Amino acid sequence: MFDSLEVIKENSHEDASLRLQELIGKFIQDDEKFSLGLSGGSTPRFFYQNFANTYQENSDISLWTIDDRHVPINDEISNQRMINEIFSKTKMKILELQFNENPNMSADEYSKLVLSNIQNFNCAILGVGDDGHIASLFPNTTAMNNKSIGFVANEVNILSKWRITSTFELLSNIENVYLLVTGENKSDILKEIGKDNELPVNQLIKHRKKTVLETDQKI
């Protein structure tokens, strides 16, 4: 296992989520700008709801979307839709990933929006897919080789043909990255995390000085 990977095990998904909020909360200071990258899926929802309740009055927090399926925001599989539903009633600034018919244009526009609003990428929460993908950086897809810091369109043909995703370089340059991987259904991929192989999650861990894995499973 990489020395740069710190593993924190809790007894349940809820405990792991609360511990994650405690860790991230240490970086949030009064009257200081703070940015948090958000992933989609059901795993982080409990964390998001608690985070929204705790920091609902904090207008210094900017939220950006790590990746999304290339679908309209009102689509039920849109990550941005879930983020908006949870955080829209808070004072936090949501940097919304807008849908454009051309996925490359969507990625370019979101790169400009995020990079013009965020000077320091403080924290981000990532899930890990059963195939080891992070964000929408799937194994053997072209986006894995993009060297820019920003967002790109990635053709994956999973649920939707295209995804808009943070680049590997952007994820590598975030100050604090947390992998939230919980549930018995993640036991197989958890056995692979931290190995020296070509899985996107392990490539990211290998290239970062530190990555934290929060889980409720044995590893």
Model regions and ranges:
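Short, flexible loop segments at the rims of nucleotide/cofactor-binding pockets, characterized by
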Residues: 12-15, 101-104, 155-160
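Glycine-rich beta-strand-to-loop/alpha-helix junction loops that act as flexible
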Residues: 38-43, 51, 126-130, 182
